[in-house]
């Protein structure tokens, strides 16, 4: 055989050998491999009594014991007041949501937007509007639903949450963020924490307040009981929501009581407003909800003058009259005759509880006596002194005394915290990178009902074997190409 033929034959032999080795390497030690789970997204609108916010959540498409490991990736506060304030302009409620939806669409990948479950949950503000005028409430919901459907999302509906749902979803949020429901272990797995007590949740909104906790006794009133199954574990909770006891509605009820106690005179002396503070309001600004019905003899346009007297001794007495503290025999109560077992364990107080106490620098686990003294000291300051000290807070400055004393009355006389259990209350707005509220708990509970996606299953190799197989394939290709080139272009002598 001439020399050219020998070289070409050798190269072809090498090509065959390299190919066989590559084939063997690609066939041995093949393992089943699961690709990392994809990511799902969800949107929840929190349509509160004072404002609306949109939260964007994500979680792995596979789940841990049936519940998603959810994280907050974006939030957006809608401009303007809550959707209940659009009772006379329903279209405005829908239009107000669009800028936040645009922001959410920039976060969620385009290919996943159409399968993103989207919800709007309304709380006490819409509960009150529904009581006041159900037709207007339906019109507002129709317009916000229409606006959301203009976006490429899987809109699942707008609804009014019950008070118990609002409270219990807030409880889920608190305990999820503080890792009492599930925790990532050193072994690299999500596990249910052992010997960890769950936390209670205290929520104060504009129109309602909620208390939720796991009591140490059997819950006697099933109307205040809720059961959740999360991450494979059952939780039996006490929860109750008090409508009209949110900070805004309670303040209106207090103003109405002072007006009525003064025989409906045009000048109202307010012991909870700073001395020297003066404000002109109308009857309609006080008596504008089912919490504060308008007496028939009053004209909504009538002008009233409110003058602060700065009396922190008289203020709690006036606030306490808003609560009915009587209770039936042989049972424990919160207030208004509602059954409540004794408070137990640690509590997180958020929303209105946090905002007011944060302004007063009372979120640092101070004693009840210290909190009382601080609030009283603030209430004793006159209006000019407060404006000089806090010029940037002038719009809401007159409310901090009344809300501070209201919170104290609610927690101590209403929910029955005392000097010993007060230290168990933690005032907070966030935990980790997420806001504390009902929306995250709502989404966590919702993922129980969203089907799990099976992990994609493929065949895989050890990286070293895969690299070896690729190397021999490359060598086989090179040897084959050289053989072809020699055969075509090497001229025999």
Curated annotation (Swiss-Prot):
Family designation: Belongs to the GDA1/CD39 NTPase family.
Membrane-side (Cytoplasmic) residue stretches: 1-7, 487-493
PANTHER family, alphabetized: ADENOSINE/GUANOSINE DIPHOSPHATASE (PTHR11782), ECTONUCLEOSIDE TRIPHOSPHATE DIPHOSPHOHYDROLASE 8 (PTHR11782:SF31)
Organism, as annotated: Gallus gallus (Chicken)
Cross-referenced Gene3D superfamilies: 3.30.420.40, Exopolyphosphatase. Domain 2
Segments on the Extracellular face: 29-463
Transmembrane segments: 8-28, 464-486
Active site, renumbered: 166
Cofactors required: Ca(2+); Mg(2+)
Post-translational events: N-glycosylated.
Biological processes annotated in GO: nucleoside diphosphate catabolic process
InterPro entries given in the database record: GDA1_CD39_NTPase
Cofactor mode of binding and number, as noted: Ca(2+) or Mg(2+). Has lower efficiency with Mg(2+).
Catalysed reactions, semicolon-separated: a ribonucleoside 5'-triphosphate + 2 H2O = a ribonucleoside 5'-phosphate + 2 phosphate + 2 H(+)
Name the record gives this protein: Ectonucleoside triphosphate diphosphohydrolase 8
Membrane topology qualifier: Multi-pass membrane protein
Function field: Canalicular ectonucleoside NTPDase responsible for the main hepatic NTPDase activity. Ectonucleoside ATPases catalyze the hydrolysis of gamma- and beta-phosphate residues of nucleotides, playing a central role in concentration of extracellular nucleotides.
Molecular function per GO: apyrase activity; ATP binding; GDP phosphatase activity; metal ion binding; ribonucleoside triphosphate phosphatase activity; UDP phosphatase activity
Compartments, record wording: Cell membrane
Pfam short name (any one): GDA1_CD39
Cross-referenced PROSITE patterns: GDA1_CD39_NTPASE
A GO cellular component annotation in the UniProt record: plasma membrane
Covalent S-S links between cysteines: 76-100, 244-291, 327-333, 379-401
Glycosylation sites: 65, 79, 133, 223, 234, 267, 324, 330, 361, 372, 382, 445
């Amino acid at each position: 055989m001439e020399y050219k033929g020998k070289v070409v034959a050798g190269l072809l032999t090498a090509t065959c050998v390299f190919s066989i080795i590559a084939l063997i390497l690609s066939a041995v030690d093949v393992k089943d491999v699961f690709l990392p789970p994809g990511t799902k997204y969800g949107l929840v609108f929190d349509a509160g009594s004072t404002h609306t916010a949109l939260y964007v959540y994500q979680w792995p498409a596979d789940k841990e014991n049936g519940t998603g490991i959810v994280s907050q990736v974006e939030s957006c506060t809608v401009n303007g007041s809550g959707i209940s304030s659009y009772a006379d302009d329903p279209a405005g409620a829908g239009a107000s949501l669009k800028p936040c939806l645009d922001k959410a669409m920039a976060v969620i990948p385009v290919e996943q937007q159409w399968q993103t479950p989207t919800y709007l949950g309304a709380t006490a503000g819409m509960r009150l509007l529904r009581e006041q005028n159900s037709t207007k409430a339906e019109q507002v919901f129709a317009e916000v639903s229409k606006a959301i459907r203009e976006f490429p999302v899987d809109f699942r509906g707008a609804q009014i949450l019950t008070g118990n749902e609002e409270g219990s979803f807030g409880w889920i949020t608190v305990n999820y963020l503080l890792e009492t429901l599930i925790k990532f272990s050193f072994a690299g797995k999500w596990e249910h924490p052992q010997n960890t007590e769950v936390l209670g949740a205290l929520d104060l909104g504009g129109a309602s307040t909620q208390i939720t906790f796991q009591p140490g006794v059997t819950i006697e009133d099933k109307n205040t009981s809720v059961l959740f199954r999360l991450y494979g574990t059952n939780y039996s909770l006490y929860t109750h929501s008090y409508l009209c006891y949110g900070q805004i509605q309670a303040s209106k009820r207090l103003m109405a009581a002072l007006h009525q106690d003064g025989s409906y005179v045009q000048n109202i002396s307010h012991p909870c407003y700073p001395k020297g503070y003066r404000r002109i309001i109308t009857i309609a600004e006080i008596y504008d909800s089912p919490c504060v019905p308008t007496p028939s003899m009053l004209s909504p346009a009538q002008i009233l003058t409110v003058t602060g007297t700065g009396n922190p001794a008289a203020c709690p007495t006036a606030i306490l009259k808003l609560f009915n503290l009587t209770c039936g025999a042989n049972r424990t109560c919160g207030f208004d005759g509602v059954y409540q077992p004794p408070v137990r364990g640690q509590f997180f107080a958020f929303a209105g509880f946090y905002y007011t106490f944060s302004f007063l620098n009372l979120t640092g686990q101070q004693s009840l006596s210290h909190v009382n003294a601080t609030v009283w000291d603030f209430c004793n300051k006159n209006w000019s002194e407060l404006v000089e000290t806090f010029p940037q807070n002038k719009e809401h400055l007159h409310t901090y005394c009344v809300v501070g004393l209201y919170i104290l009355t609610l927690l101590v006389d209403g929910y029955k915290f005392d000097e010993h259990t007060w230290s168990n209350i933690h005032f907070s707005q966030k935990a980790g990178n997420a806001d504390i509220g009902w929306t995250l708990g709502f989404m966590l509970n919702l993922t129980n009902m969203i089907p799990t996606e099976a992990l994609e299953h493929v065949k895989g190799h050890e990286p070293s074997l895969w690299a070896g197989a690729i190397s021999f394939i490359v060598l086989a290709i090179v040897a084959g190409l050289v053989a072809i080139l020699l055969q075509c272009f090497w001229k025999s002598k």
